[in-house]
Amino acid sequence: MSLLNKPKSEMTPEELQKREEEEFNTGPLSVLTQSVKNNTQVLINCRNNKKLLGRVKAFDRHCNMVLENVKEMWTEVPKSGKGKKKSKPVNKDRYISKMFLRGDSVIVVLRNPLIAGK
């Protein structure tokens, strides 16, 4: 019987480990697996409406991640005084050398479009 069809409750710890590895290599988490193996950048949209562009060093099934060389990007609308027109949004960013990202704040993870196209 294939590991994908067998109920998890009937699996040995070794079979569970093998199945998780298989899912990480073929399932949706394969984007993160490839990023770790090839040291490529990913773009992560977060729930705080910020984007993170960086390299994934490690991750788990909850999408918790250790990231390096991260550029955090967001937009801010400056406060306008009385009688002034609406201000235009301003793009902001900052560099973070190492960070831990909790998985529940992740919306979507994309391969770096500049490299993925090659």
Swiss-Prot record:
The modification N-acetylserine is found at residue 2. Residues 1-31 are annotated as: Disordered. One of its GO terms (molecular function) is RNA binding. The modification Phosphoserine is found at residue 9. Keywords: Acetylation, Cytoplasm, Isopeptide bond, mRNA processing, mRNA splicing, Nucleus, Phosphoprotein, Ribonucleoprotein, Spliceosome, Ubl conjugation. It is found in: Cytoplasm, Cytosol; Nucleus. PROSITE patterns: SM. Residues 7-21 have a biased composition (Basic and acidic residues). One of its GO terms (biological process) is U2-type prespliceosome assembly. The modification Phosphothreonine is found at residue 12. Plays a role in pre-mRNA splicing as a core component of the spliceosomal U1, U2, U4 and U5 small nuclear ribonucleoproteins (snRNPs), the building blocks of the spliceosome. Component of both the pre-catalytic spliceosome B complex and activated spliceosome C complexes. As a component of the minor spliceosome, involved in the splicing of U12-type introns in pre-mRNAs. Belongs to the snRNP core protein family. In the autoimmune disease systemic lupus erythematosus, antinuclear antibodies are developed with Sm specificity. Core component of the spliceosomal U1, U2, U4 and U5 small nuclear ribonucleoproteins (snRNPs), the building blocks of the spliceosome. Most spliceosomal snRNPs contain a common set of Sm proteins, SNRPB, SNRPD1, SNRPD2, SNRPD3, SNRPE, SNRPF and SNRPG that assemble in a heptameric protein ring on the Sm site of the small nuclear RNA to form the core snRNP. Component of the U1 snRNP. The U1 snRNP is composed of the U1 snRNA and the 7 core Sm proteins SNRPB, SNRPD1, SNRPD2, SNRPD3, SNRPE, SNRPF and SNRPG, and at least three U1 snRNP-specific proteins SNRNP70/U1-70K, SNRPA/U1-A and SNRPC/U1-C. This is Small nuclear ribonucleoprotein Sm D2.
